[in-house]
A protein has these predicted regions:
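Active-site metal-coordination segments of metallo-dependent hydrolases
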Residues: 30-39, 128-135, 183
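Short beta-strand scaffold positions
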Residues: 61-62, 139, 161-162
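Domain-level recognition of soluble alpha/beta enzyme cores
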Residues: 178-203
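Phosphate-coordination/substrate-recognition cap region in phosphate-metabolizing enzymes
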Residues: 8, 45-119, 180
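An N-terminal RHG(E/S)-centered segment typical of histidine phosphatases
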Residues: 1-57, 72-76, 154, 196-211
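Generic beta-sheet signal
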Residues: 13, 156-164
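Short glycine/proline- and acidic residue-enriched helix-loop micro-motifs
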Residues: 111-136
C-alpha cells in the first residue's frame, strides 16, 4: 500500500477485507456474525503494522465483529487511537435478514473508541434494508459510497473494513459502475484502493494489496 500511496489530490477510499474468521462459537451473535480465529488475529496484527505510518482521516467498519476487529487492529497502532464509525449498511451480503450486527456497546469491548455512524443512510428511524438480492446490495453500497463522497473531500483518505462480497460491491460503486461482469478474489486483510479525482473520474489504484 505504501508503494502506491501518494498525495495526488484524490479522495482515497481503501476497502479492507477482514481477517480469517471462525463461525464455530458466535455466542450471543447471529450465526452469520463470526469472530476472528487465531490466524485472523495474527493477520490483523500484521495489517496494523502495514498501516501504521499511512495517514488516514477516518475509519469505518461494518457492524459485524470480524470486520470491526480488523479495523481496530489498524487503529490500535495509531498514536491518537482514532474513532471507528460503525455502519450496519455495509454488512456482508446474505447476512440473516433482520440482523443488523453488533451494537456500539458490544463492539466497545474490543476497541473503546467506537461509535455508530452519525446517519442512517436509508433515512428510517430503525435500520431497515436487505442484504439478499443484487439490487439490495447495489443500493446500500452505493448509498454508503455517496455518503463518503459527500462527507469527505479531495486529498483525504478513508479506510473501510468490510467483508468479501460487500467489498466487491463497494469497489464497483466507488468506480461508478452500475453493471459489471467481473469478480475479485479478495485475500484476508487485503487492501483495495479506489481514488476519486476532482475531474470526475475514478481509478482502481491497487487491488488485493498485502504490503
Amino acid at each position: 500500500m505504501k508503494r502506491v500511496f501518494e498525495d495526488n489530490g484524490s479522495l482515497k477510499l481503501i476497502f479492507i477485507r477482514h481477517g480469517k474468521p471462525d463461525y464455530n462459537d458466535c455466542g450471543d451473535r447471529d450465526v452469520s456474525d463470526g469472530d476472528l480465529d487465531a490466524t485472523g488475529i495474527e493477520q490483523c496484527k500484521a495489517l496494523g503494522q502495514r498501516f501504521k505510518d499511512i495517514p488516514v482521516d477516518a475509519y469505518f467498519s461494518s457492524s459485524l465483529l470480524r470486520a470491526f476487529r480488523t479495523a481496530a487492529a489498524i487503529c490500535k497502532e495509531k498514536p491518537d487511537q482514532p474513532a471507528i464509525e460503525i455502519c450496519p449498511e455495509i454488512m456482508e451480503c446474505g447476512t440473516t435478514r433482520g440482523y443488523y450486527g453488533c451494537s456500539e456497546e458490544y463492539l466497545r469491548r474490543y476497541y473503546p473508541n467506537a461509535k455508530l455512524c452519525d446517519t442512517k443512510m436509508f433515512g428510517t428511524e430503525e435500520y431497515d434494508f436487505g442484504c439478499d438480492t443484487d439490487e439490495e446490495n447495489k443500493l446500500r453500497t452505493r448509498k454508503f459510497v455517496e455518503y463518503l463522497k459527500d462527507r469527505f473531500t479531495y486529498g483525504q483518505c478513508v479506510v473501510v473494513a468490510c467483508q468479501y462480497a460487500t467489498c466487491e460491491y463497494l469497489v464497483a460503486a466507488a468506480l461508478g459502475l452500475k453493471e459489471w461482469d467481473f469478480h475479485f478474489a479478495f485475500t484476508y486483510t487485503s487492501a483495495t484502493m479506489v481514488e476519486i479525482f476532482p475531474e470526475g473520474y475514478s481509478l482502481l489504484r491497487c487491488l488485493n494489496a498485502m504490503d
